[in-house]
């Protein structure tokens, strides 16, 4: 087994109780640009797992923050974080410090991709379809609905369907179908409480230090 293939075996805190996990990952120091560059160079050129471990642990807070953005899909946040951590490890494995940008910038794509694939699998989008347009709808419909029709349940109005289809460059019927499917799936997944009610999510909030 090559050294780089061992990155998936790096030890990171277990995502059990979320508040405990968040407290644990705060203990890992953030890296300045120079330190990050040297660690990434050492990992890329020498396969130094200690360097890779520092790169991973210093970005666990980033994963947690990104994962919180997907909690509206009714899935356990600890599972979202675990999936995001896998994406982070892939980012570290492929990161080239000579490209001139920071690891966080590069890792965000991998983290989001890993979490999104998990959400798609969990929501059984195989039945809904997994075209580019449908994925775009799935991950943007709720946000746009909250912008143009906050708090509205049920079918969208014609003008709302038109607005969403224009913003996302998809067909109107796709908007209608996805909205109905997501509403039905939310009920089966015991979706989070509605906007304005936060009690059920108190234990899942990231503190301000992640902003």
Each model region followed by its residue ranges:
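Short, charge-rich amphipathic segments
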Residues: 1, 157-162, 166
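Short, basic interhelical loop/turn and adjoining N-cap
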Residues: 166-177
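Acidic, proline/glycine-rich intrinsically disordered inter-domain spacer in sigma factors
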Residues: 8-12, 146-160, 173, 191, ...
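Conserved alpha/beta core segments of nucleic-acid transaction machinery
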Residues: 123-139, 179-211
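Alpha-helical promoter-recognition and RNA polymerase-docking modules of transcription initiation factors
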Residues: 2-128, 132-151, 163, 210-211
């Amino acid at each position: 087994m090559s050294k780089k293939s061992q990155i998936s075996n790096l030890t990171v805190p277990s995502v059990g109780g979320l508040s405990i996990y968040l407290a644990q990952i705060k203990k890992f120091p953030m890296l300045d640009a120079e330190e990050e560059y040297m660690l990434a160079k050492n990992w890329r050129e020498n396969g130094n797992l200690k360097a890779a471990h520092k790169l991973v642990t210093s970005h666990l807070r980033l994963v947690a923050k990104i994962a919180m953005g997907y909690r509206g899909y009714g899935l356990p946040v600890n599972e979202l974080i675990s999936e995001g951590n896998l994406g982070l490890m892939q980012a570290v494995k492929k990161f080239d410090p000579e490209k001139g940008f920071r690891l966080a910038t590069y890792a965000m794509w991998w983290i989001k991709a890993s979490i999104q694939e998990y959400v798609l699998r969990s929501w059984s989008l195989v039945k809904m379809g997994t075209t580019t347009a449908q994925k775009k709808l799935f991950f943007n419909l709720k946000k746009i609905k909250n912008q143009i029709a906050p708090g509205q349940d049920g079918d969208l109005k014609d003008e709302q369907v038109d607005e969403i289809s224009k913003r996302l460059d998809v067909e109107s019927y796709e908007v209608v179908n996805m909205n109905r499917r997501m509403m039905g799936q939310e009920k089966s997944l015991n979706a989070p409480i509605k906007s304005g009610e936060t009690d059920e999510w108190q234990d899942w909030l990231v503190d301000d230090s992640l902003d």
